[in-house]
Amino acid sequence: MKYMENNNTSHSKHPFIIGVTGGTASGKTTVCDEIMKRLENKRIAIICLDSFYRPLSKEDRETVASYNFDHPDAFDWSLVENALRDLKDGKDIEIPTYCFKSHSRLEETVGLGDVDVILFEGILSFYTQSLREQMDIKIFVDTDSDTRLSRRVMRDIAERGRSLEGVLYQYEKFVKPAFDDYILPTKKHADVIIPRGADNVVAIDLIVQHISSKLSEKESFRKSQGQLNVNGGSNTASSVNHA
């Protein structure tokens, strides 16, 4: 999870939630980073769906090479749905920490609350209706399959110590079928589609303008409600005094 704080702004307990999805290595995280960078005067957190993987059983760990991490069953949907719902309701939450080496959920969690914007990203961020209902805007990062494959190969070899053969096997057996069967169909739920991912600066700028506008509207409404409460309180006090 990434977090950026600015202490010079007032905050709302009901954050603006942005869902970001797309295929593996499509540039989801980079798009989120660019949005975060441009909204520098806000408190922002990036939550990754990867944090909500189910811990593998002993049997699954023994055959981890054939475990499908791109299938919906790999995620704890109840946990992630409750987390997003609580955030939307203005509650503080604890985000789990998933260890990719042991394929287990660690005891330590990451606390989160009182933010202006939540960027929730992952390959299946739009998978359930309950998740989609919590989102104020839904973004699909649309990058061609050749680019995604080349990025995945370079990333997994460099960062995860995998062989080229192993990466290609996993891609053909799990990653590509999961994209076709589960990820691509959620594209229809997107409010905004970003072709070419983070390279599409114009699209990201337009999205940030829209988000800034919506946040300004929320802030204006919050202030007006506060003013109404103050005025209402004054009127009540006045009537009591006259009595």
Curated annotation (Swiss-Prot):
Gene3D superfamilies hit by this protein: P-loop containing nucleotide triphosphate hydrolases
Protein name: Uridine-cytidine kinase B
InterPro entries cross-referenced by the UniProt entry: P-loop_NTPase (IPR027417), PRK/URK (IPR006083), Uridine_kinase-like (IPR000764)
Annotated family: Belongs to the uridine kinase family.
Enzyme Commission number(s) from the entry: 2.7.1.48
Sorted UniProt keywords: ATP-binding, Kinase, Nucleotide-binding, Transferase
Reaction(s) the record says it catalyses: uridine + ATP = UMP + ADP + H(+); cytidine + ATP = CMP + ADP + H(+)
Any one GO molecular-function label of the UniProt entry: uridine kinase activity
EC class of the enzyme, as a word: transferase
Chain positions recorded as ATP binding sites: 22-29
Function: Catalyzes the conversion of uridine into uridine monophosphate and cytidine into cytidine monophosphate in the pyrimidine salvage pathway.
Pathway entry: Pyrimidine metabolism; CTP biosynthesis via salvage pathway; CTP from cytidine: step 1/3; Pyrimidine metabolism; UMP biosynthesis via salvage pathway; UMP from uridine: step 1/1
Biological processes, Gene Ontology terms: CTP salvage; pyrimidine-containing compound salvage; UMP salvage
Record bears the keyword Kinase: yes
GO cellular component, one term: cytoplasm
